[in-house]
């Protein structure tokens, strides 16, 4: 909630904030749209409002997602590529991206960001494909299952390593 976030920022007095918190599952965003939008966008605007009124010197980093471009036909996406969100998750990330640009420009806040493409980490839950594969292979190896079921495998997606993105 915004009050708690603002109290923490006020107490800690950071020089920099790196915000990696949000609801990050595209499928879930369709099931719980208000929660997804609130945690991904409204919470960020609450932080921006705090920075605007209390401490414009804090440097702020906000990642967003390539999902905000939707199923683009472009071979190479750029910051000025057309936004075409196709899920609540992508809509929330698009809104956060635009809010970051607006607060930076209009209110002279130090806000920078990065457009992240798909990335994986050991912390991912078993619902994500790389963890499904790892868990499935382990289950087959240990005799718990006879085959690996993935579902739709038509997607063409590149992945990066989350730690590399953060560094």
Regions found by a protein language model. Give the residues of each.
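NAD(P)-dependent short-chain dehydrogenase/reductase
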Residues: 74-75, 98-166
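Acidic-enriched, low-complexity/disordered segments with a strong bias for Aspartate over Glutamate
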Residues: 1, 10, 15, 22-24, ...
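N-terminal Rossmann-like NAD(P)+-binding domain of SDR-like oxidoreductases, especially those catalyzing
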Residues: 1-119
């Amino acid at each position: 909630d915004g009050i708690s976030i603002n109290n923490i920022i006020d107490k800690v007095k950071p020089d920099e904030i790196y915000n990696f918190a949000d609801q990050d599952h595209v499928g879930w965003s369709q099931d719980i749209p208000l929660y997804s939008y609130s945690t991904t966008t409204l919470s960020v605007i609450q932080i921006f409002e705090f920075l605007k009124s209390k401490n414009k010197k804090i440097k702020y980093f906000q990642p967003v997602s390539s999902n905000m471009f939707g199923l683009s036909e472009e071979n190479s996406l750029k910051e000025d590529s057309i936004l075409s969100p196709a899920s609540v998750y992508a809509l929330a990330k698009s809104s956060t991206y635009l809010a970051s640009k607006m607060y930076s420009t209009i209110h002279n806040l130090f806000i920078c960001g990065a457009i992240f493409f798909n990335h994986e980490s050991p912390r991912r839950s078993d619902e994500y494909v790389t963890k499904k594969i790892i868990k499935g292979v382990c289950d087959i190896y240990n005799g718990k299952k006879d085959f690996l079921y993935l579902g739709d495998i038509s997607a063409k997606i590149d992945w990066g390593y989350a730690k590399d993105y953060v560094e």
